[in-house]
Amino acid sequence: MKIAEIAKEAGVSVGTVDRVLHKRGRVSAATKARIEKIIQENGYVPNAMARNLKIGSNLKFGILIPKLDSESGYWHKIYNGIKKAGDEIAAFNISLVIKEFDRDEENSLNEEGKQLIEENVDAIALAPVIQKEAFSFVKSLKDIPYAFFDSSITNASPISENIQIAYKAGWCGARVMQLFSPNNNNFICLQMHESAYNQQQRAQGFIDFFKQKNIPIKTYTWKREKNLSFNKFLDSLFEDNNNIDGIFITNDATGLISKYVLKKELLNTPYIIGFDLVEDNKEELLNGNISAIISQSPETQGYNTIMDMYKILFLKQEDNINKCPIPINIIIKENLP
């Protein structure tokens, strides 16, 4: 068995198995006995790359991610997955360097990315949420491999992508909206970041689903550069849309918008569908104010991205990475985890 297989069988991390194999670090007696029993029964085949790796050699992975405290905690969930993977591979002298950028500040992504390059990282994982800026950055990387999480950009060549297919997610959102409200057709779509490619694709998927049914969708985008506050944006929107049947939101602002809708005296209560199981959205889903949430499994995104880089760059197992997109999980009140 290989080290990853032993770890899976024992229900521990690969780092824990490594500590037992090489008799370093602390491992509980029970865990050690369980791992040793698995090795004794099945054998252990050392990975050629790990066996031949020079003692003291290191790998450094750079992470380029939006501000962790932004967008209701969604990015912090991705960070949790990244950190979990980083802890598991730390035993192999692999370290993480994390830089946060402000997606609402021009050139912030590039500036933070340049700092990663200056730190001589061996690879970079990033969320390319600003399409033009991210494309410019990855083109500047030259020989540094890179991986994407959260979203993708066209004409790029990442070594790994852990993303949800945004267009299909928008289409699914429309399908669920129709199930909730089959006899109505007054729906609107709200996009919170004009430059976010994945949000554009979600909106397009939602629009195209209803287009085939000859139902036009009103689309609104919060354009932050116009210095229009979020509440004023919503005030203006609902002045023109007082009798809507459903609202589709392309990011995790769903809970904020549902709370706003409750305070407004609309002619009817619209169905609300959005993204991400952040705490605010969970609360509103349980209260019945949000109809459904599309989960992107952010922790899984972060974890798989780092493990893919580990497999490709350390283990040299390019064919052993997960190439399936993140599932489009529809969460309602009754199946909330």
Model-assigned labels for residue ranges:
Residues 1-55:
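N-terminal helix-turn-helix DNA-binding module of bacterial transcription factors
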Residues 38, 210, 297-337:
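Hinge/cleft segment of the Venus flytrap/periplasmic-binding protein
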Residues 47-107:
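Amphipathic helical "hinge" segments at domain boundaries
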Residues 62, 186-190:
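Conserved beta-strand elements of the Class I
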Residues 67-73, 98-108, 130, 162-171, ...:
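Hinge/beta->alpha junction and helix N-cap segments in small-molecule ligand-binding domains
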Residues 123-139, 206, 223-280:
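Hydrophobic alpha-helical
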Residues 130-168, 278-286:
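Flexible loop/hinge segments that line or gate small-molecule binding clefts
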Residues 160-185, 281, 297-314:
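Hydrophobic alpha-helical segments within soluble ligand-binding/sensing domains
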